[in-house]
Amino acid sequence: MEGSPVTSVRLSSVVPASVVGENKPRQLTPMDLAMKLHYVRAVYFFKGARDFTVADVKNTMFTLQSLLQSYHHVSGRIRMSDNDNDTSAAAIPYIRCNDSGIRVVEANVEEFTVEKWLELDDRSIDHRFLVYDHVLGPDLTFSPLVFLQITQFKCGGLCIGLSWAHILGDVFSASTFMKTLGQLVSGHAPTKPVYPKTPELTSHARNDGEAISIEKIDSVGEYWLLTNKCKMGRHIFNFSLNHIDSLMAKYTTRDQPFSEVDILYALIWKSLLNIRGETNTNVITICDRKKSSTCWNEDLVISVVEKNDEMVGISELAALIAGEKREENGAIKRMIEQDKGSSDFFTYGANLTFVNLDEIDMYELEINGGKPDFVNYTIHGVGDKGVVLVFPKQNFARIVSVVMPEEDLAKLKEEVTNMII
């Protein structure tokens, strides 16, 4: 799909119902800064036959003030602070909780019903057209951290699209925000999110050495977007339950009881080793999450896995993933703190990066008892080595979403198809 089918785009701002931020600063942690150039994007599709109308959702969206009471930092704006009174050091960004609000976008798609849209093979169109294309900057002091887009389709269906600056929190944090939105739209008191005050490293965190899970680059200034050397593409693989059962039977044994996520990681890793060669894909990054209800980036667990042997199969790669992960949270924190804001860093795509979304219920957004028919998450602002998101298992399939250079993507589709036949 070349041209945008979206019409009648209208933007407005929504601010908290009362003063909650009090202009207080919210400091960004090193883990926030490791995610500074990344954005979480999501779409929630609702087909036409529902107990609520698009007008109901739109009208309630303008009472988002109640939601922003709990998420006051989401309504803030980026500011720059002096670095420990060191005039030679760069300024450090933080969030000024000044109740400036979020953006709400209303739009229409008149050519499609939701059902016809979801029948299209290319799922990259979800985030191209149904999520507002927002990044922070170049006017940082005026850039909203969150955009919500409500798109009405023909015959009553709708899509709610989210663009979420990753400095606010990970995919779990964004999903919790949307769940709370659903509670508000349904007339329920929203659950207040949990934001701890002091990050704590796990006992096995490594503080020694340089982190290889993130990449250091020159400062991007006030336009917070990673520049790619090649054109990036998106694709969704739908692994049926039969595919999953076949892969598990083929590559796991009683002595090697790998998880489905381990096998899917290994399958994609092996495919890209075949495509890119040994030297470019010997190291992968894995993003897990602590079992926690907190909404922030500090609960991310960033690990690396290194492959040393030249000829390695899927079972051997799965064994490395299951048993040889090396956590780097401590090293990441130390690197970013020592840099003192003079450079920028990125995580997704610094190496081939895998993100485990298994613990996230993407379908928690519920409006008047109705859950979405399809949910699609992705990461925007990904480095050239790509990112792979493994979605939670659904009734009929497990989705694996990838963002890769287009040249690799075409070959990856063929490799994966050959491996699951």
Curated annotation (Swiss-Prot):
The modification N-acetylmethionine is found at residue 1. It comes from the Eukaryota. It comes from Arabidopsis thaliana (Mouse-ear cress). It is found in: Endoplasmic reticulum; Nucleus. GO terms for cellular component: endoplasmic reticulum; nucleus. Disruption phenotype: Bright green and glossy stems and siliques due to low abundance of cuticular wax. Increased levels of C26 and C28 alcohols and disappearance of C29 alkane and C30 alcohol in the stem wax. GO terms for biological process: cell wall organization; pollen development; very long-chain fatty acid biosynthetic process; wax biosynthetic process. Pfam families: Transferase (PF02458). The lineage of its organism: Eukaryota, Viridiplantae, Streptophyta, Embryophyta, Tracheophyta. Keywords: Acetylation, Cell wall biogenesis/degradation, Endoplasmic reticulum, Nucleus. This is Protein ECERIFERUM 2. InterPro entries: CAT-like_dom_sf (IPR023213), Plant_Fungal_Acyltransferase (IPR050317). Expressed at high levels in the epidermis of stems and young siliques. Expressed in flowers. Transmembrane segments: none annotated.
